[in-house]
């Protein structure tokens, strides 16, 4: 995998608060190599390590995108939801930003069935078929459609398991991360000072609570994916 320059600078990360960790009582000792200091009762992340792993992650996604691979971005907590959706749409990635339904990947056949139901209902709505049904039936199907849109809207074009999964918060999305590990799907994960750095394939030590921090990390990864996709299009 070729190493590239991704314009990751420490000043930008400081401004975004990427270095702020959790309170010193809420930490995972495995994060010690990624922590540079304690300040006013909170751990401070070593941004040199953050830059290194973010750069590695950008190399990985660029390489995968340049080969036409598919990505899934997962981040369901309120702070991250909108950022996840906009980043994914920008880079034409699949995303889950409301709730991770257990077994979404490990029980893919069930997910496929739900997706087919979702596509069928969307098609019926577009053609106006729902409006020709009795009022009660139409209302029930519209509720179903709304629920499916909420939970599966970001993966409606997914036709198989993703090649790489990007996870915004390890603790919040632990079920999704475990499913990827079980299936051997490579993962990139933001990890705060209370996380385990040994679960994901590439763990990026960063503040997973601040919107500015999440936005910065996602923007770098998405830019790398977009560059990789451009390379893929040029060569095919």
UniProtKB/Swiss-Prot annotation:
Pfam families the UniProt entry points to: Ribosomal_S2
InterPro entries: Ribosomal_uS2, Ribosomal_uS2_bac/mit/plastid, Ribosomal_uS2_CS, Ribosomal_uS2_flav_dom_sf
CDD domains: RPS2 (cd01425)
Keyword hit for Ribosomal protein: yes
UniProt similarity note: Belongs to the universal ribosomal protein uS2 family.
Subcellular location: Plastid, Chloroplast
Gene: rps2
Organism superkingdom: Eukaryota
Entry GO MF terms: structural constituent of ribosome
Single biological process term from Gene Ontology: translation
Species in which this protein is naturally found: Lemna minor (Common duckweed)
One annotated Gene Ontology cellular component of this protein: mitochondrial small ribosomal subunit
UniProt keyword list: Chloroplast, Plastid, Ribonucleoprotein, Ribosomal protein
Signal peptide residue numbers: none
The protein, known as: Small ribosomal subunit protein uS2c
PANTHER family: 30S RIBOSOMAL PROTEIN S2 PROKARYOTIC AND ORGANELLAR (PTHR12534), SMALL RIBOSOMAL SUBUNIT PROTEIN US2M (PTHR12534:SF0)
Presence of the UniProt keyword Cytoplasm in the record: no
């Amino acid at each position: 995998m070729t190493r590239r320059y991704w314009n990751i600078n420490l000043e930008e990360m400081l401004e975004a608060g990427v270095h702020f960790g959790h309170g010193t009582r809420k930490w995972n000792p495995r994060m010690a190599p990624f922590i540079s200091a304690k300040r006013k009762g909170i751990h401070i992340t070593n941004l040199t390590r953050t830059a290194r792993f973010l750069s590695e992650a950008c190399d990985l996604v660029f390489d995968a995108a340049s080969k036409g691979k598919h990505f899934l971005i997962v981040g369901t907590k309120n702070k991250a939801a909108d950022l996840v959706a906009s980043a994914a749409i920008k880079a034409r990635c699949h995303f889950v930003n409301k709730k991770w339904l257990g077994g979404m990947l490990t029980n893919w056949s069930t997910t496929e069935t739900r997706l087919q139901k979702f596509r069928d209902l969307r098609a019926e709505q577009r053609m106006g078929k729902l409006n020709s049904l009795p009022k009660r039936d139409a209302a029930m199907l519209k509720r179903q459609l709304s629920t499916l849109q909420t939970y599966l809207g970001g993966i409606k074009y997914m036709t198989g398991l993703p090649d790489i999964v990007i996870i915004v918060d390890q603790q919040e999305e632990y079920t999704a991360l475990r499913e990827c590990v079980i299936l051997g799907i490579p993962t990139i994960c933001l990890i705060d000072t209370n996380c385990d750095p040994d679960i994901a394939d590439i763990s990026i030590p960063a503040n997973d609570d601040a919107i500015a921090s999440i936005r910065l990390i996602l923007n770098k990864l998405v830019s790398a994916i977009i560059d990789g996709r451009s390379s893929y299009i040029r060569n095919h």
